[in-house]
Structures are given as C-alpha cells and as structure tokens.
Amino acid sequence: MNGLITVVMPVYGRAALVEQAIASVRNQSVPHWRLLIADDGSDPPTEALLRRLASADPRIDLVRRPRNLGLFANLNATLAEVTTPWLLILCSDDLLEPEAIAVLEGLIHRHPACQLLLSSYRSIDAAGALRFDVNGWYTDQFAPVSREFAPGELLPVLLRFGSINGNITGLLMRRDLFERTGPWRSDWRQAADWEWLIRAAERSRVWINRQPIARVRVHGGQLSNDNRVDQREGEEIAAVVRQLRDHPALAAWPQRHRWAAYHAQFLLWNALKAWPRVGWRATARQLALIHRGAGLGRTALALLAVLPGRLRIRGSDRPLPPPAP
C-alpha cells in the first residue's frame, strides 16, 4: 500500500494550529503516507515553520505560492501535483485521528468502485474541546450508518441537506476522479465544494463513512465566517441551489422547489439582519440573488415556517431541522 494516499494541506498563516495539524499526520498508526503542504503565500513566521517541519520528515513535501491564490485556486494547483492514486484533504486548523489513514486504506480496498469517500468527523472548538457535531447530526438523517451511493443518487440529498461534507477536511478522492470532474471554481470562496460535489456525484459511486477520521475546528477566524459577514456566500449558494433545483435528474422531484427555498431562507435571514449595516442597495442585490435561486415568495414562506424553530434553538449550538422529505 505504499504511496496510496497523499494528504493535501492548504495553508495560509495560522502557525500555531498548522503545527498541530502536521503532527496529527506524522502520528498516524501506519507509516506509509505522503503529506503535500501547499503554502498559499503565508507570512514569514509560518513559512519558516513549514520549512522546518518539512525538512524533518522525508514524507513531507512543501510547495509555496509566490502570492496568495485563495483556497480553491491553491487546491486546484496542488491536486495537479499529486502523484499517488488517492488524495485526502486536511485543512491546516484541523486534525487527523491516529487511525485515519489505516481506516481509509481499508475502505479503499473494500469498496473499489467508490472513487469518492466522505467521512464523518468530530467537531472541536478553538481550544480543541469537543462540541456538538452539527454535520454528523445532519448526516444521521440520510446515512445513519456507512453506505454506498450510486452515481447520481446523491443529487437529491445535496439539495435537501446542502453541502453534506460540511468541511473539505476528510474529503478522499481518486486523483483521476478529480481530473474527470474538473477543478473547483477558483473564483468562489464559500460554496465551491458543494458545487464540485454535484459534478463528482454524477460521475462516481460515493461511500459515506460514518467512522470519524478527523477533528474539525470551529472558530471565528474561519473563511466561512468572513464570507457570511460580507455576504459573499449569497451569490454562490443561490447559484448552487438553482443548479440543483433545475438539474435534469431532479425534474421528477416536486420537493425540489421546497428544498431550494429552505436553503434560500438562510440567505434571506442573513440579508434582513445585515440590512441596517449594508444598506438598501446591497440588500436588494441579495434579494435578487435569492429570487433567481429559489423564488423570493417561496423563500419568504420558508422563512416564516422555520421562525418557531429559530426561536427554540436561539442561543444554542443546535441546528434547524432539514426540510421534510
């Protein structure tokens, strides 16, 4: 199995956390792995740390971008440099469980028809303490145990439940699947993984692995939080929702309009909350995006329908339940 999996780690700063992430790879229970660190133009202290850690282990390779490309452009460039058959993504603020590589190698050999594996993970806070696992709670609704999905079978799941991976950490794919599916949208910052999953799920069998193989950190400095503050997520999420709603494979699913409106109501909620800060012009643009993605009327009704649920979970880390089947 030597040379089966390369762990790909995109890095941009966060020196204190990236050292822990690299240590979690080096502490794997099996020795036959590769780690490819893609430094996306980090600050000098982080660059120096990465060079020191890479020089300490021959299994670690380091590439450095002369300028910051952004997460998905950096990943596109990095995945093109992977030479092993499989690649596993690990974000620089997350951790692999010690048995992760061993577990994934076993799954690869037991399910050879699956070229994409999405694994559960444990959710931790900034200090590393376990917290409520929102993504696992959602996954319980459609895959309470590990199971295989045929090509195209995940498309309704991706519309009803959203970006089911929840995070790119733990995403394991065959290199040739990435080549056939095409790159992530490098001009996107929030929903590029969701959009890419649509294309990948059309082409390959997918294994949903419910054994956690990583610890994913939730903290205020994440890119997703930055995108939400300045509303960049609206355009991308509305586009993905519309893509799924109008997908030919879902034409016979009348629920698709209701599911699309459920996701769009989050955008409407955020747009209304941001209105005093961003003004009418920016809010009107968000409303237009929502209308194109799911229909403003349907979305407003969906928002009203979930308001009682919002009040019940206010102040907690519990999520809204997914839309009905």
Regions found by a protein language model. Give the residues of each.
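Conserved nucleotide-sugar donor-binding catalytic segment
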Residues: 7, 138-237
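Short, acidic, metal-binding catalytic loop of nucleotide-sugar glycosyltransferases
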Residues: 23-32
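A conserved acidic beta->alpha catalytic loop
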Residues: 31, 39-48, 67, 91
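Acidic helix N-cap motif at the loop->helix transition within catalytic regions
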Residues: 44-52, 95, 99
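Glycine-rich, basic loop-to-helix element that forms the pyrophosphate-binding segment
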Residues: 65-82, 95
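Short aromatic/hydrophobic "clamp" motif used to bind/position activated sugar donors
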Residues: 87
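Conserved donor NDP-sugar-binding/catalytic core segment of glycosyltransferases
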Residues: 99-138
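C-terminal subregions of glycosyltransferases and related glycan-biosynthesis enzymes
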Residues: 159-161, 194-195, 202, 218-325
